[in-house]
Regions:
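Conserved phosphate/ATP/ADP-binding segment of small-molecule kinases
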Residues: 71-164
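Hydrophobic beta-strand scaffold residues
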Residues: 62-64, 95
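Charged helix-capping and loop-helix junction motifs
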Residues: 17, 45-50, 76-85
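Conserved N-terminal subdomain of the carbohydrate kinase-like
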Residues: 1-38
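A generic structural signal for short hydrophobic patches within well-formed alpha-helices
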Residues: 17, 38, 69, 101-102
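A short helix->loop->beta-strand "cap" motif at the edges of active sites that frequently abuts
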Residues: 56-61, 135-139
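Conserved post-catalytic alpha-helical subdomain immediately downstream of the catalytic base
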Residues: 167-218
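Anion (oxyanion) recognition and catalysis
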Residues: 49, 53-57, 88, 208
Length: 218
């Protein structure tokens, strides 16, 4: 269950922002859009679409974390599939696992998840090969790899395709205090590394470390 009725974020509107200043005059390098916000309401769906269009028009790179949530999509599949597909077609960086790509974008692929980390890696690679054919504008695809041992012990890794090169941070054990925010930390670290013009293998390493820090920091 997810009750967000009355949340101020549901009313986000591009009319409240100076998009010309943000994208044209100040030249934002990357804008990150979340599938959670995109699916939050009809207003936020349009908000993210308009941001993506404005960013593309002005040469700003677009990062999109699909972040599928069944409670947000209930009864809205057609509307959200159309919006997510357009945003993904404009995006340079796509973040999500097999389930996200299947349910948000309708890309057929292997069964989400897998029995172990190695199978998850192979499933993700196969999915991205298919996604690239549908969304050729994107050049970076990434996701985290998580295997829960127990509530406080996880194996945490990450995988990324940049251009034609795969980069993997092999899962290692981390002591988790609160798993919430690990994915956001990962994306934040990934984007930071890209903005710093580090070599691609460091993008995924810094994203991994940022996500690990977010879940283990007291």
């Amino acid at each position: 269950h997810n009750d967000r009725a009355g949340e101020i974020g549901r009313t986000l509107n591009t009319k409240d922002f100076d998009l010309d200043r943000i994208f044209a005059k100040e030249g934002v390098q990357i804008i990150h859009l979340s599938g959670l916000i995109s699916a939050l309401s009809e207003e936020t769906c349009n908000f993210c679409l308009e941001l993506a269009r404005a960013a593309k028009k002005n040469g700003t790179k677009i990062s999109f974390d699909l972040n599928y949530r069944a409670t947000f999509w209930k009864g809205r599949d057609k509307e959200l599939r159309s919006a997510f597909t357009e945003i993904a077609s404009l995006s340079d960086i796509l973040v999500g696992n097999e389930e996200d790509f299947q349910l948000c974008l309708g890309i057929e692929g292997p069964e989400a998840g897998g029995k172990g980390i190695e199978e998850k890696i192979e499933n993700f690679k196969e999915m991205i090969r298919r996604v690239k054919k549908t969304f050729p504008n994107a050049s970076v695809f990434a996701t985290t790899l998580r295997e829960v041992v127990n509530s406080n012990k996880h194996l945490w890794g990450a995988i990324m395709l940049e251009g034609s090169n795969w980069h993997v941070v092999n899962p290692r054990e981390i002591n988790v205090l609160d798993r919430i925010g690990g994915g956001d930390g990962f994306v934040g670290g990934l984007i930071y590394a890209i903005l710093k013009n580090w070599e691609p293998k460091k993008w995924i390493q810094f994203g991994w470390a940022s996500g690990a820090l977010a879940t283990t920091f007291q």
